[in-house]
Swiss-Prot record:
GO cellular component: cytosolic large ribosomal subunit
Protein name per UniProt: Large ribosomal subunit protein uL18
UniProt subunit comment: Part of the 50S ribosomal subunit; part of the 5S rRNA/L5/L18/L25 subcomplex. Contacts the 5S and 23S rRNAs.
Function: This is one of the proteins that bind and probably mediate the attachment of the 5S RNA into the large ribosomal subunit, where it forms part of the central protuberance.
SUPFAM superfamilies noted in UniProt: Translational machinery components
Keywords on record: Ribonucleoprotein, Ribosomal protein, RNA-binding, rRNA-binding
InterPro entries registered for this protein in UniProt: Ribosomal_uL18_bac-type (IPR004389), Ribosomal_uL18_bac/euk (IPR005484)
Transmembrane segments: none
Organism this protein belongs to: Parvibaculum lavamentivorans (strain DS-1 / DSM 13023 / NCIMB 13966)
Amino acid sequence: MSNMKTLSQRRAMRNRAKLAKASVVRPRLSVFRSSKHIYAQVIDDTRGVTVAAASSLDEKFGKKAGTDVAAAGEVGKLLAQRAKDAGITDVVFDRGGYIYHGRVKALAEGAREGGLNF
C-alpha cells in the first residue's frame, strides 16, 4: 500500500516539476479530488497567492453537488468565471498526478467552456 502512495506522490511531483517552467508565465489551475468532493484553484506561483477557487462545497451548489462528473463540470465553469473576474484567462493545468479522465477531465472541459485557455 505504501508503495502505491509513494508512486502517486512521485507522479504528482514529476508533473509539478514540468509545470514549474510554464507557471512562471501563467498561473496554475490545481485540482484536488476527494472521495466526496472536487476542489480547484488558480494559483499565481510567482506571488504565492490563490487568485480564484471553487469546489463542489460552494454555496452556489447547495447540497446537490457531489462527486459525479456533472458536478465537476459545474465546478470548472464556476472557477473559470471567478478567474475571469480576477483578470486571468490563460492558465497551466495541474492535474496533480490524477489521470486525465472522469471528474478531472470534466472539470477541465468545464473550465474551457467557461473561457479559460490551457
